[in-house]
């Protein structure tokens, strides 16, 4: 059975974090009922790099990619599978950028 909500996919998000960020010690993954965030643990940067997937009102999924300086990309959809696809894309991009610096 395909999971269709953030809270039902907690293990999937934790495994995604382990897969993309296993060699980066300064990252964390937090999963809530309507939101999941992978972020850089940084005491130096007040606006750390992160990728967020959030279920907003009217069943709209919003994905935000912060590059550590500003909001770099956003995406909104009503389709959960499309939201997951974009979330994975931005998570991979975040991991790649964190390895550079």
Predicted regions and their residues:
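Mixed-charge, Lys/Arg-enriched low-complexity segments
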Residues: 1-12, 65-101
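Negatively charged, low-complexity tracts enriched in Asp/Glu with abundant Ser/Thr
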Residues: 1-45, 101
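Beta-strand-connecting loop/turn residues
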Residues: 34-35, 58-59, 79
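Short aromatic-glycine-(Arg/Gly/Cys) micro-motifs in beta-strand/loop hairpins
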Residues: 45-72
């Amino acid at each position: 059975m395909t999971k269709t909500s953030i809270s039902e996919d907690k293990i999937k998000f934790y495994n995604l974090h382990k897969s993309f960020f296993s060699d980066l010690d300064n990252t964390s993954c937090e999963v809530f009922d309507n939101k999941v965030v992978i972020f850089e643990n940084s005491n130096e940067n007040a606006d750390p790099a992160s990728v967020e997937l959030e279920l907003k009102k009217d069943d709209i999924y919003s994905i935000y990619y912060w590059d550590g300086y500003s909001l770099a990309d956003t995406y909104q959809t009503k389709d959960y599978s499309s939201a997951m696809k974009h979330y994975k894309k931005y998570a991979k991009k975040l991991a790649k950028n964190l390895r550079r610096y």
